[in-house]
Amino acid sequence: MKRIAILTSGGDAPGMNAATRAVVRKAIYEGLEVYGINYGFLGLVNGDIRKLELGSVGDLLHRGGTFLYSARYPEFATEEGQLKGIEQLKKHQIDGLVVIGGDGSYHGAEALTKRGFPTIGIPGTIDNDISGTDFTIGFDTALNTVLDALDKIRDTATSHERTFIIEVMGRDAGDIALWSGLAGGAEAIIVPEESFNMDDVVDRLNKGRERGKKHSIIVVAEGVMSGNEFAKQLAEYGDYHARVTVLGHVQRGGSPTAFDRVLASRLGARSVELLLEKRGGLAVGIRENRIVENDISEILKEKHTLDQKLFDLASILSI
């Protein structure tokens, strides 16, 4: 193996640049040439490929987003799209590929693997919804962004004796809501994986009022319903006219935390090692602080599950 390439795909996540930096520098250290593919699989099909040097990834470690840019390209699910991608890889004499992204990116990596092209997947998504790893790149940073907002909102909630609803990202996975809600002491956490009853939510808030608590925070994952819809339903069940804060895309931005930088560096370096070992078709991850790798097809078959014990703990501590 003499040349490898790297791309980022799907929603950006803080730490993608740190992972790219690790891949480039580890590969060059091992004597490989490295190419960056702009705009994900769209750029691959269009041949938007450039050579990367050590200096290309200087000053990247602390930057959020992805300097390789990202784009969604559903056409890569077609045979035509995949063959065009492989044609471009062969044209540039690239021997292996590293893909950083979430579930959709993994499907693209799997497709290339099935067509005989060595590909490694790195989990990069703030949702933390990829199986085979305890944490995905970007989750910790997003979590801290939400927690910072939650702490500030609690200040004003306390001052005005109000209920606030914070809507966070998480279409199918509630990890951001769960972890931020637990860390921020939310009175209720609403996630896609757990059914909820508005009567129970109101009962919990009422019990807090009886103890003298005059403010409350509810964290709602967007996949359940919008924060505004939740506020509307809450008002129908009790005397709770809540203010709503939708954090939106601020959760994707910002300088990555130390944890995300270290995680990205470890996963990026291991990806290069796997390609040198001629072990394509794998996804790297972290389990109990150890770097692991799993068959990417098996990862896609598994459904990410919410930490039930953590959810139960959050419920106990929010009493």
UniProtKB/Swiss-Prot annotation:
Annotated residues for binding of substrate: 125-127, 162, 169-171, 222, 243, 249-252
Reported function: Catalyzes the phosphorylation of D-fructose 6-phosphate to fructose 1,6-bisphosphate by ATP, the first committing step of glycolysis.
The reaction(s) this protein catalyses: beta-D-fructose 6-phosphate + ATP = beta-D-fructose 1,6-bisphosphate + ADP + H(+)
Protein name, UniProt field: ATP-dependent 6-phosphofructokinase
Main subcellular location: cytoplasm
This protein's pathway: Carbohydrate degradation; glycolysis; D-glyceraldehyde 3-phosphate and glycerone phosphate from D-glucose: step 3/4
Keywords tagged on the record: Allosteric enzyme, ATP-binding, Cytoplasm, Glycolysis, Kinase, Magnesium, Metal-binding, Nucleotide-binding, Transferase
GO molecular function, one term: AMP binding
Quaternary structure annotation from Swiss-Prot or TrEMBL: Homotetramer.
EC number: 2.7.1.11
Regulation: Allosterically activated by ADP and other diphosphonucleosides, and allosterically inhibited by phosphoenolpyruvate.
Sites where the protein binds ATP: 11, 72-73, 102-105
A cellular component annotation (GO) from this entry: 6-phosphofructokinase complex
Binding site for Mg(2+): 103
Keyword Transferase included in the entry's annotation: yes
A GO biological process held by the record: canonical glycolysis
Class in the EC hierarchy, top level: transferase
CDD domains in alphabetical order: Bacterial_PFK
Encoding gene, per UniProt annotation: pfkA
Similarity field: Belongs to the phosphofructokinase type A (PFKA) family. ATP-dependent PFK group I subfamily. Prokaryotic clade 'B1' sub-subfamily.
The organism of origin for this protein: Listeria monocytogenes serotype 4a (strain HCC23)
Active site residues according to the UniProt entry: 127
